[in-house]
């Protein structure tokens, strides 16, 4: 070590390593100190770069120099432990005094060669050829036999033995083999201790009470540990000193064919992972087996352990009670109650359902919406769902709950489409419209306002009651190739107004087929489970009016002949939803003055051609029929059917409601009043001009 650095450099290195200078030569301590101070001097960690560079230079020089010295000398201790008074004699490791002068003659001259080279030549000449040990060992152990007197020295070898020794000396490989063979014949190998059988798992009779999850982060408060009796006693005492706060602990002995073991049953105050409890046990069990699992049925397990073949050894409490194993169940929101509400209120919008149910969390006695009674879905259900809504307000899965409820509504609707006929579906829609009208359509002025919408439609179409009944018949029966309705006319002729009213009446959906062909499939997917659909403002390639812009709606429609016919099932798809094969619903289509190809026109059973009428537009401008969306409502269509058609024209299921509403209309609206409303519309006046004022006076 002294050859590696100078004295000043050694002191400087030890100061940089921040250890005492007396530790010079202790390589293990120096290496450990080097790792520690490297973190202090490293520039990336805010240290001194100059000190770090100097430390690396000195420490690297020490390591390189030591490697060179070891490679030259062959042994790091040969120089320091050489003694002039000993040499290797004729037999191996034999002590023999030696003439100092003879040895000194062999010592190298400082000016010639190196010490390491001379030492290797000296060792090879003096000892390597004589490195042979002939010995015999007794097969009996030294501990078993008493000490005997020292045997006499062996006699001098005979000439034959000397020749044999010389032969062995010349062939060291055979020497190694003979000595090895002698050791195996004289000293047999030690017998391995027979390992005790360790159980692979808990007793089979306890499987039903334990959790068999392999990788689980779930926390539990009941655990069962299976180990030896000694370790069970140790764990029973040391578990109190750990971070696991134990409320109840008991140990049970168990013996089977494989041996005897002990079961330690723990119930903790807090919840822990199985891995945490097992890690605590493994840290104290080096050789003993250990098994640890969570308990899913604590009370049943305790009762089973209290019976043979198990035996109670000790427990910190005299028995346990039922309530100690039961957790207080937190009251959670009732998902099914929300689903039932969505079905009864027929809500198929997730966000709408979410908003309605959040409003239910308000105290019913302080709710302004219940006092106004504007929406039936609110004031009829608020009180019954208030408690569940308070829990729903704290839930983190509000949207998931509402999505599940909406899915049930859509599933029930699809089931009705499969089980019910279209007439039965229409009857159900009639009853739904009647119930909704009961909520808002009451009072003479309100009824007169809605009857003004009925009168407007009678002026728009000649024999409108027959036309409406015909449309109703075509859409309901949905006969193949005789079920679609086309409403065509110039701008501002009332096409979309009439079509939108029928869409609300049938509870259908509007589709846009003027989109590019690659997006058309997803647009048509909106027709899944619909009673009918509206294709509004379809554009064509050839225009009959120079002010119209061409479009590709008619071209797309020409590629949907199977959809329009309704003869075979077509595949409809939505995003993130599998394709569904069904008959495409009947179509009500509106379009301006475009040329319609015969291949499309023949697939419409009814063609309505509307013409713009100035007095209809003037009448609407002077009334609130458009602002209140009366003309766009299906209630107006239903009121027109009630006003003009007899009771017998309706199905028996809805006749009771029809009679009730016909009586209501006759009570508030006379035939004379209705004629005056029609005349006001023809004159371009407010439909209720001179009627509502007289009634109010």
Swiss-Prot record:
Stretches annotated zinc finger (T-ag D1-type): 330-422
Cofactor: Mg(2+)
Modified residues (Phosphoserine): 134, 140
Chain ranges of the SF3 helicase domain: 463-623
Biased composition range(s): Acidic residues: 159-169
PTM summary: Phosphorylated on both serine and threonine residues. Small t antigen inhibits the dephosphorylation by the AC form of PP2A. O-Glycosylated near the C-terminal region.
Main location: host cell
Annotated positions of the N-acetylmethionine modification: 1
Reactions catalysed: Couples ATP hydrolysis with the unwinding of duplex DNA by translocating in the 3'-5' direction; ATP + H2O = ADP + phosphate + H(+)
GO cellular component labels: host cell nucleus
List of residues that carry Phosphothreonine: 187
DNA-binding region: 203-323
Record's compositionally biased regions (Low complexity): 170-183
Disordered as annotated region, ranges: 136-198
Location of the J domain: 12-75
Free-text function comment from the UniProt entry: Isoform large T antigen is a key early protein essential for both driving viral replication and inducing cellular transformation. Plays a role in viral genome replication by driving entry of quiescent cells into the cell cycle and by autoregulating the synthesis of viral early mRNA. Displays highly oncogenic activities by corrupting the host cellular checkpoint mechanisms that guard cell division and the transcription, replication, and repair of DNA. Participates in the modulation of cellular gene expression preceeding viral DNA replication.
Protein name: Large T antigen
Taxonomic lineage: Viruses, Monodnaviria, Shotokuvirae, Cossaviricota, Papovaviricetes
């Amino acid at each position: 070590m002294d050859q590696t650095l100078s004295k000043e450099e050694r002191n400087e290195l030890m100061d940089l390593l921040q250890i005492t200078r007396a530790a010079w030569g202790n390589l293990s301590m120096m290496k450990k100190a080097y790792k520690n101070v490297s973190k202090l001097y490293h520039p990336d960690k805010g240290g001194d770069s100059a000190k770090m560079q100097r430390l690396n230079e000195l420490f690297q020089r020490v390591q390189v120099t030591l490697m060179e010295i070891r490679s030259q000398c062959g042994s790091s201790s040969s120089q320091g432990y050489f003694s002039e008074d000993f040499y290797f004699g004729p037999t191996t490791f034999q002590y023999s005094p030696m003439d100092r002068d003879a040895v000194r003659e062999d010592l190298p001259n400082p000016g010639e060669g190196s010490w390491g080279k001379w030492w290797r030549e000296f060792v090879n000449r003096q000892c390597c050829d004589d490195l042979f040990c002939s010995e015999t060992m007794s097969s009996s152990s030294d501990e078993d036999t008493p000490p005997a007197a020292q045997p006499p020295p062996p006699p001098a070898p005979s000439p034959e033995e000397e020749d044999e020794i010389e032969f062995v000396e010349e062939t060291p490989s055979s020497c190694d083999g003979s000595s090895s063979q002698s050791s195996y014949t004289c000293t047999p190998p030690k017998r391995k201790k027979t390992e005790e059988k360790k159980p692979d798992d808990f007793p089979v009779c306890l499987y039903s009470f334990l959790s068999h999850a392999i990788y689980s982060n779930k926390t539990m408060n009941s655990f069962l540990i299976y180990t030896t009796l000694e370790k069970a006693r140790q764990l029973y005492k040391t578990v109190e000193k750990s971070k696991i706060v134990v409320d109840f602990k008991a140990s049970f002995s168990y013996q089977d064919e494989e041996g005897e073991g002990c079961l330690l049953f723990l119930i903790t105050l807090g919840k822990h992972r199985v891995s945490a409890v097992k890690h605590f046990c493994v840290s104290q069990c080096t050789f003993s087996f250990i098994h640890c699992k969570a308990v899913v049925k604590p009370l049943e397990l305790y009762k089973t352990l209290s019976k043979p073949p198990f035996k109670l050894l000790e427990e910190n409490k005299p028995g346990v009670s039922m309530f100690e194993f039961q957790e207080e169940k937190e009251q959670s929101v009732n998902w099914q109650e929300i689903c039932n509400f969505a079905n009864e209120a027929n809500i198929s919008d997730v966000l709408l359902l979410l908003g309605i149910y959040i409003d239910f969390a308000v105290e019913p006695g302080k709710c302004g919406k219940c006092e106004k009674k504007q929406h039936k879905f609110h004031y009829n259900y608020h009180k019954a769902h208030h408690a569940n809504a308070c829990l729903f307000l704290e839930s983190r899965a509000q949207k998931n709950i509402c999505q599940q409820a909406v899915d049930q509504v859509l599933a029930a609707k699809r089931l009705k489409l499969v089980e019910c006929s279209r007439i039965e579906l229409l009857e159900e829609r009639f009853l739904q419209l009647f119930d909704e009208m009961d909520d808002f359509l009451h009072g003479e002025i309100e009824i007169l306002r809605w009857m003004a919408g009925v009168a407007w439609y009678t002026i728009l179409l000649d024999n409108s009651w027959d036309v409406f009944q015909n449309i109703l018949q075509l859409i309901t029966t949905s006969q193949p190739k005789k079920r679609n309705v086309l409403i065509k006319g110039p701008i501002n002729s009332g096409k979309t107004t009439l079509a939108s009213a029928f869409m609300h009446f049938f509870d259908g959906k509007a589709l846009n087929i003027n989109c590019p062909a690659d997006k058309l499939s997803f647009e048509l997917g909106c027709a899944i489970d619909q009673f009918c659909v509206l294709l509004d403002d379809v554009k064509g390639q050839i225009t009959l009016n120079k002010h119209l812009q061409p479009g590709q709606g008619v071209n797309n429609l020409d590629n949907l002949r199977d959809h329009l016919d309704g003869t075979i099932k077509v595949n409809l798809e939505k995003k993130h939803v599998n394709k569904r094969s069904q008959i495409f619903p009947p179509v009500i289509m509106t379009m301006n003055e475009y040329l319609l190809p015969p291949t499309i026109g023949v697939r419409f059973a009814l063609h309505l051609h509307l013409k713009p009428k100035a007095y209809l537009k003037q009448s609407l401008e002077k009334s609130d029929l458009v602002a209140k969306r009366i003309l766009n409502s299906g209630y107006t269509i239903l009121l027109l059917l009630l006003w003009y058609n007899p009771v017998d024209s309706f199905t028996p299921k809805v006749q009771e409601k029809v009679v009730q509403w016909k009586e209501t209309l006759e009570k508030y609206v006379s035939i004379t009043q209705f004629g005056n409303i029609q005349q006001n519309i023809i004159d371009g006046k407010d439909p209720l001009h001179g009627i509502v004022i007289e009634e109010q006076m």
